[in-house]
Design a protein with these regions (language model features):
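Carbohydrate transferase catalytic cores enriched for Leloir-type hexosyltransferases
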Residues: 1-163
Length: 163
């Protein structure tokens, strides 16, 4: 079973960027038994201390995908077909949302949700109101279509169960 990980994210100094880079560096040091494709932006690739791991293939995406709008378009309409082409059987999406049509392609989805801000403190989300509602909407759909959901706390789990 081939795994892909969608680590395409913001270029801004943030917890998301730090998480993505550290996660990639962690995987680079592991003795892996299966092939993993990791989708990242050019900026992340420049910052990853790339210890050549024969089982990891980085698929470098343009810096313009650091923009949330373009990232969602790519994720929903292009990423699923890239996964099919690579014969991926599982996608790990650790950035709160994922392609919602993967079920149609028989690709298992592992979603990691590291923010429950849209349900608990919606008004404290950064960005404009329309973007925040759209983000919350995509996150909710991703939760409903995923095969496995990973949350970072019991509090977050309790909030998600109530959706």
């Amino acid at each position: 079973m081939t795994l892909a990980i969608d680590m395409v994210g913001t270029n801004l100094g943030s917890g998301t960027k730090t998480y993505n880079i550290n996660f990639c560096e962690y995987l680079n040091k592991r003795n892996l038994n299966e092939r993993i494709y990791i989708f990242i932006t050019e900026t992340y690739k420049e910052e990853i201390n790339d210890k050549k791991n024969k089982n990891i293939t980085y698929i470098i995406k343009s810096k313009f995908l650091a923009n949330i709008f373009f990232r969602i378009i790519w994720m929903q309409f292009f990423l699923p077909f890239e996964l099919i082409k690579l014969k991926v059987s599982r996608l790990s999406s650790p950035m709160n949302f994922s392609p919602v049509i993967l079920k149609f392609f028989n690709i298992k989805l592992i979603l990691a949700l590291h923010s429950n801000l849209p349900w608990v403190f919606f008004k404290q989300m950064s960005g404009n109101l329309l973007r925040n509602y759209f983000t919350k909407f995509i996150m909710e759909i991703s939760i409903f279509v995923c095969d496995k959901l990973i949350v970072d706390s019991k509090f977050a789990k309790d909030e998600i169960v109530n959706l």
